[in-house]
Amino acid sequence: MSAAPTSGPLTCRRAGPLRGAIEVPGDKSISHRSLLFGALSTGETRVTGLLDAEDVHSTRRAVEALGATVRDEGAEVVVTPPATLREPGDVIDCGNSGTSLRLLTGVLSGVPGLSVLTGDASLRRRPVRRVIDPLRVMGADLSARDGDRLPPVVVRGGPLRGARHLLPVASAQVKSALLLAGLFADGETAVVEPEKSRDHTERMLRGMGVPVRVSGLEVSVSAARPAGGRVDVPGDISSAAFFLCGAAALPGSEVTVRNLGVNETRTGLLDVLRAMGADVRLADLREVAGEPRADVTVRADRLEGTEIRGATIPRLIDELPAVMVMATQARGRTVIRDAKELRVKESDRLAAMGETLARAGARIELFEDGCAIDGPTPLRGVEVRTRLDHRIAMAMAVAQLFCGGEPVVLDDVACVATSFPGFFRLLDQVSGPASGGGAP
């Protein structure tokens, strides 16, 4: 079997069913935070299971630019913090990582000195005003391109004051940026969300000794420094989603993902799979370093359409491209609402998935905040413009399994390396191989 290309075009032509037991790479959200919180700490942080992908490499380079030392010791990555974070000597390039840029904006607001945060062409199109505006309420001196809407972001760090923030949209990145700024602020910083977003920041800061107060949808902190410690990163459910959704919809499939993070703020996908009729089983449920994990098995069954909205959306926002593919194979109508956040990801994922699935034969109607998909519908081969978005590329690679043997051609798969460099190899492992063209 020839290796799938790591950049350039790829022609996907696989056969199902999907069968096997796999492990997916470490959770991206937890990996970012492990490095960043380690750099903020008073002591050493040792991380196992850290995601080895471009987005996390961006955070690693950033914390090194701020004075932290990051070294590989066998299966562990060790973060040694500086006595105090220093002003970076150059622009910090966050690559494609919105998490890096937004969380660093919060941290650097309280670090004396001048910092400039930028990224690749995709990241420079992603909005930053919803981070900048609440940080300014805390006294942060920030500016950005296009009327403070878009990166690069210029941060002039200085004294901050605590504030109470009411977020209009649940966002773990915005919440985390404000809480991290709160670690440098005078007085209490509180964040209230309309729905609960992923809570890795709260769990990890608590695990490192920071008093984090949670009351319903409100989270608050005061000035503090984490103590460091040990972090064991579970598998990323957002990466597993492509295999779980494919297995649920493709007859004869059964896939087990071992050591998968099942934090309740991230398991909206499992709820949706069950609601649609998939056979979902969890084994060896345990908690390690404050994060629950399990071996998750999904077996194909006849799927029924469902409605996905409200508090479920923040719990599966990154999994929705895979869910949209699965919905094309479910009987009846699947409706997704309250997902406007999809329009400001690495691409406008609603528009991208809607347009691409429609060309592949799906019956799909787009709304400003979601879509409706009627099924089941046999799909056909299609050429896909990935738009530098890893989740579009991976979702459409799985969609090819429902194309009756016709190929799906991805125009450039380099973006997959931002979160899941081994994706195509693992997909080959549980299905049949792709035929491809591109860089080896």
Curated annotation (Swiss-Prot):
Q: EC annotation?
A: 2.5.1.19
Recall the GO molecular function terms of this protein's record. Answer: 3-phosphoshikimate 1-carboxyvinyltransferase activity
Q: Which Pfam families match?
A: EPSP_synthase (PF00275)
Coiled coil (residue ranges): none
Q: Where in the cell is it found?
A: Cytoplasm
Q: Which residues form the active site?
A: 318 (proton acceptor)
Q: Which GO terms describe its cellular component?
A: cytoplasm
Enzyme class, spelled out: transferase
Chief site of localization: cytoplasm
One example of a Gene Ontology biological process annotation: aromatic amino acid family biosynthetic process
Can you tell me which residues bind phosphoenolpyruvate?
28, 98, 126, 173, 349, 391
Extract the HAMAP family matched here: EPSP_synth
Q: Residues that bind 3-phosphoshikimate, according to the entry?
A: 28-29, 33, 171, 173, 318, 345
Q: Which domain of life is it from?
A: Bacteria
Keywords from the UniProt entry = Amino-acid biosynthesis, Aromatic amino acid biosynthesis, Cytoplasm, Transferase
Which organism was this protein described from?
Anaeromyxobacter sp. (strain K)
Full protein name: 3-phosphoshikimate 1-carboxyvinyltransferase
Known pathway = Metabolic intermediate biosynthesis; chorismate biosynthesis; chorismate from D-erythrose 4-phosphate and phosphoenolpyruvate: step 6/7
The gene behind this protein is aroA
Assembly, in brief, is: Monomer.
Q: Describe the task this protein carries out.
A: Catalyzes the transfer of the enolpyruvyl moiety of phosphoenolpyruvate (PEP) to the 5-hydroxyl of shikimate-3-phosphate (S3P) to produce enolpyruvyl shikimate-3-phosphate and inorganic phosphate.
Residues passing through the membrane, by range: none
Quote the SUPFAM superfamilies the UniProt record gives: EPT/RTPC-like
Which family does the record assign? Belongs to the EPSP synthase family.
